[in-house]
């Protein structure tokens, strides 16, 4: 969304770097949008005390600043900016290794944090956890814009690093079914219990055989009936007993389904209970959106929570998919209780093709598609980044407004992207030759060639030992405020 000529008159030179600022004097509401020092992504303190408003005049809400993603790759070098609320319609960052897609996504996350919008980063490789490292905050940065952003973030961020699946860091215990489903409308409850059943079925390695399909159906019915019968949390132990005892209400709900399957499913769940103790560690902090977003009792005055969830310690993909599916279900439930007309939080999924692939149906796919559709009304922005854009499910593109398309060289990936590129009026021949940080930004049928702004964090993969050490430090302090 490039500003019009009239709008440019109200944007001073430094607005080009998309940072929330404080006025040096008392400007009008229109003048507040962007000023010189906003260019560097830093909240600027006034040079002299502003004139106090009349006592009877109510304080107007703080106006959010546009998020600067870069500038057009043209002679004019016009800034390319987004209204923060546009991200409630989601964004996809596509590009191969070295394209700069992750630093572009983090640039957006950082600017939102400076405006008080918390974020969750779901990190598969360990290269998003640098915000928890002392090296990031003490490093000398040559680029003055990045240096000023780094300083601003130091004063504003509240970093929490989680390592689900490993007690040596900061584990997060997930419920096999989120609490509070009994309070949801029937459709929402049944959808959530079905998603939870699919996640458990993935952990049990159930496939598409008739017997496995019947077990999936029985599992979904068991969870749905249990949450209606009691307000107790659904645990594997309780679920095993409920199914193994062939509760009359459950038997009635499944109709003519073979009752022999009850024993098989109960045995399978009991084995999972023994195998997945670390994953479901009841002694760990509980997965809770207020914890991840730094709200309520977890809030730190004057700071914005940035939670990094490292999935490196969860084991194989089935475990990762199960854990992330539970996160997606919890996020959806939280949104239904905390709707917002404006952006209130963001979640970045790195290598999102694992969760939303084009051809497979992992346990994360339906919850992710459901969240993409529903997050806008809840004020949540989803950011999906992937190194394998050809494997990404483009069927969701109608619900994703902004597409940041970086360098992609693989012919197979380009061929799979052609329908989307054609719809966005992007010439596929130009994609492989883009340099690092160069993107085609497509939104609402409009395309800009953009040179992206870098994030303050230069991503670097941390070792497992370093991740655990940093996570334990945020656990012991409750957070890391640099």
Question: Which positions does each model-derived feature cover?
Answer:
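Conserved P-loop NTPase motor module
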Residues: 3-8, 24, 28-32, 47-68, ...
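Conserved beta-strand position immediately N-terminal to the Walker
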Residues: 91-92, 307, 383
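P-loop NTPase motor domains
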Residues: 104, 110-118, 126-131, 136-373, ...
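Conserved H-loop
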Residues: 124, 350, 380, 387-388, ...
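A short helix-turn-beta junction within AAA+ P-loop NTPase domains corresponding to the substrate/partner-engaging
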Residues: 161, 395-407
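Conserved AAA+ ATPase core "coupling" helix
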Residues: 173-174, 410-419
